[in-house]
Amino acid sequence: MLDIKKIRADFDGVAAKLATRGVEKEKLEKLHDLDIKRRELIVKSEALKAERNSVSDEISQVKRAKGDASTQIAAMQKVSAEIKAIDAELAEIEENLNEIIIMLPNLPHESTPIGADEDDNVEVRRVGQTPTFNFEPKAHWDLGEDLGILDWERGGKVTGSRFLFYKGAGARLERALYNFMLDEHGKEGYTEMITPYMVNQESMFGTGQYPKFKEDTFELKDDRGFVLIPTAEVPLTNYYRGEILDGSELPIKFTAMSPSFRSEAGSAGRDTRGLIRLHQFHKVEMVKFAKPDQSYDELEKMTANAENILQKLGLAYRVVALSTGDMGFSAAKTYDLEVWIPAQNTYREISSCSNCEDFQARRAQIRYRDEDGKVQLLHTLNGSGLAVGRTVAAILENYQNEDGSITVPEILRPYMGGLEVIK
C-alpha cells in the first residue's frame, strides 16, 4: 500500500510514476481531493471537541455555583451533534479513500524499465548454451505421456483441465527437484519452513493479492473464508504480520516448498497443454525481510540464488527486467528468469524475483526497530526458487534423447537413487 504522505507531498511525481503502471490521474486526483477534505474535517472535529470540553468545564463550574447551566447544556448538545455528523462524514470519506489507495499498485523503482507490457521488458543477460538436437525435439507433454510419467487424461478425469498425475520416475523427479532446491537455498542461509496451505483474507491483503486479484484464487465457501495459497510468499511474508522485528537480525531469509493454487482467470486458451500453466503446482519460494538501505543488494542476491539452481541443472536461461506495465501489483522492481524450452523455441518464465520495498510491509504492518530505537517499516522481497513443474518441463525437453528417454542431470542423480536415464 502506498504512503498517503508521499502522495500528498509529491502528487505530480507519484501520478507520473503510477501512469506508467496504467493508473489514470483522475483516480489519484479523487484520492487527493478526499485527503484534503478528510484533513479539513479532522481539524474541524478537533476544534469542536475542544469547544465541547470547554463548555463541559463551564457546566461543571455553573453547577458547583448552584447556577442554571441550561444554556451551556444546550450549547454542548449542539456541538456534540455537529461532532457526530462530522465524524460520520469523516468515516465515509476514509472508507472511500481507503477503497482507492488499496487498489493502487506499488511505485516503480527508478531502475525499472518504463513500458506498457512484456514487449517493453529489457533483457539483462543470457546464461548457458541452448541445446542442439539432430532430431526434432518433442514437447514435454508428449515425452511425459510416452514415458508413462505424466498423466493428464486421468488428472482431467479425477478433477478437470489443468490437473495431472505425476507417476513413477515423474513423481520422483518432481520430488528430487524440490529437495535439491531447498538444500541449495539452505546453503545460502535461508531458513526452511513448512507453511499452512490455507490462509485467512487478512494475509491475502497483506501481500497484495486481495482485494484486487480475488478472482485468481480458490476461496473456501464457508464463514471463515480461508484461501488456498497461490504461492508460499503469502504465509511466509505474513509470518511477521503486525510485529516489530529487531533490526540487528535483518535480513531474515525464509524458503518453503508448497503447492500453489491458481484459478488462472483470464488465461483461457493459453498453455492449455503441459506443465506451464496449471491450477495446482509445486513451487519453492524465497522470502526476505530487509532494511530499506539493503533491499536492492538483497534482490540481486536472491536473483543469483534462483540462477544458481538453473546453472547447477545445466539449463540455459535469460534474466529479464520487467517493465512497469508487466510488473506485479506489489513489486517496485522485478527480474524474471526465463528458461529455454526447445519445443517452443523460446524462453519461458520459471522464476520472478521482486523487491516490494515497504508496500507489503505497510499493508501487513511489519516493522523493525533500528539501532536508534526508531520503529519503521522494513522492505519485503520474494522470489521463486523455482517453479517445480516448469523445471520438470525444462529438464524433459532439454535432456531428451532421440529414443524418447531422458538423461537425468548429474546433480539430481543422488536424489533419485542414482537413476541416470528415465526410459
UniProtKB/Swiss-Prot annotation:
It catalyses: tRNA(Ser) + L-serine + ATP = L-seryl-tRNA(Ser) + AMP + diphosphate + H(+); tRNA(Sec) + L-serine + ATP = L-seryl-tRNA(Sec) + AMP + diphosphate + H(+). It is found in: Cytoplasm. It comes from the Bacteria. Gene3D superfamilies: Bira Bifunctional Protein, Domain 2, Serine-tRNA synthetase, tRNA binding domain. Its EC number is 6.1.1.11. ATP binds at residues 262-264, 349-352. One of its GO terms (molecular function) is catalytic activity, acting on a protein. L-serine binds at residues 231-233, 285, 384. InterPro entries: aa-tRNA-synt_IIb, aa-tRNA-synth_II, aa-tRNA-synth_II/BPL/LPL, Ser-tRNA-ligase_type_1, Ser-tRNA-synth_1_N, SerRS_1_N_sf, SerRS_core, tRNA-bd_arm. It is an enzyme of class 6 (ligase). Keywords: Aminoacyl-tRNA synthetase, ATP-binding, Cytoplasm, Ligase, Nucleotide-binding, Protein biosynthesis. Homodimer. The tRNA molecule binds across the dimer. Catalyzes the attachment of serine to tRNA(Ser). Is also able to aminoacylate tRNA(Sec) with serine, to form the misacylated tRNA L-seryl-tRNA(Sec), which will be further converted into selenocysteinyl-tRNA(Sec). Belongs to the class-II aminoacyl-tRNA synthetase family. Type-1 seryl-tRNA synthetase subfamily. This is Serine--tRNA ligase. It comes from Lactococcus lactis subsp. cremoris (strain MG1363). The lineage of its organism: Bacteria, Bacillati, Bacillota, Bacilli, Lactobacillales. The gene is serS.
